[in-house]
A protein has these predicted regions:
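A short acidic, helix-capping loop that chelates divalent metal ions and anchors anionic groups
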Residues: 45
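Long, contiguous binding/interaction regions
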Residues: 2-41, 53-79
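Helix N-cap motif at beta-to-alpha junctions
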Residues: 48-51
Length: 79
């Protein structure tokens, strides 16, 4: 199994990386670029066949290690 994880800044949190990318795109002549949000994408290979156990394990890893729950949201899917 594989977990695909997306971690993004919370909507209420300032995203300086996203703002920098947004400004750079505007300076490069890309019109109409709105807000840009920069996050993280991870793929984790998982052993075993118990999807519910894998879901619990990834949720715990995201909450305790992979994301900062104060300033980031995460979502994932198990394939």
């Amino acid at each position: 199994m594989k977990a695909k994880i997306i971690i993004t800044p919370k909507k209420a949190v300032l995203d300086p990386q996203g703002k920098t990318v947004q400004n750079a795109l505007a300076q490069m002549g890309y019109p109409g670029v709105g807000a840009v949000h920069v996050g993280k994408y991870l793929e984790i290979e998982l052993a075993g066949a118990d999807r519910e156990a894998a879901r619990r394990q990834i949720d715990e890893a995201c909450h305790k290690l992979l994301s900062n729950p104060v300033i980031e949201d995460y979502r994932f899917e198990i394939e």
